[in-house]
């Protein structure tokens, strides 16, 4: 952690939010991806993050610790003419909650913007402190 701790903390939040946005974009892009019956259906990617504890109890930001797949069963849609239909005529749809992804998209976007606001405010505070010394 540098002397510009608030910048580092906010930057970690922005990185986590960007990873979250990337995962959401990937999930939305694959909302209609269908795979052959012998392959697992697409599952939404979930970003797993944890708080980074600081020695002084304040904390040092956030870290992405992994990407997991969403739980749940794929929706079975009867479409015997689809090339990926199983022997019973069912196609397994992706495990992606589009409405949930859109809600997460708004939250991730707001989180990213808030962290960038902290970066800007911290930078302005440091610049003001430097001007005092002149």
Mark where each language-model region is.
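Amphipathic alpha-helical polymerization modules
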Residues: 1-134
């Amino acid at each position: 952690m540098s002397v510009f701790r608030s910048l580092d903390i906010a930057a970690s939040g922005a990185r986590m939010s960007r990873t979250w946005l990337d995962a959401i974009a990937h999930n939305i892009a694959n909302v209609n991806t269908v795979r052959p019956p012998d392959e697992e259906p697409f599952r939404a990617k979930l970003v797993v993050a944890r708080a980074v504890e600081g020695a002084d109890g304040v904390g040092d930001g956030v870290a992405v610790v992994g990407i997991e797949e969403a739980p749940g069963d794929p929706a079975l849609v009867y479409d015997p003419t689809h090339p990926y239909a199983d022997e019973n005529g069912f196609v397994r749809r992706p495990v992606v909650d589009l409405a949930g992804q859109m809600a997460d998209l708004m939250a991730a976007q707001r989180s990213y913007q808030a962290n960038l606001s902290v970066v800007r405010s911290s930078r302005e505070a440091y610049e003001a402190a430097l001007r005092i010394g002149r």
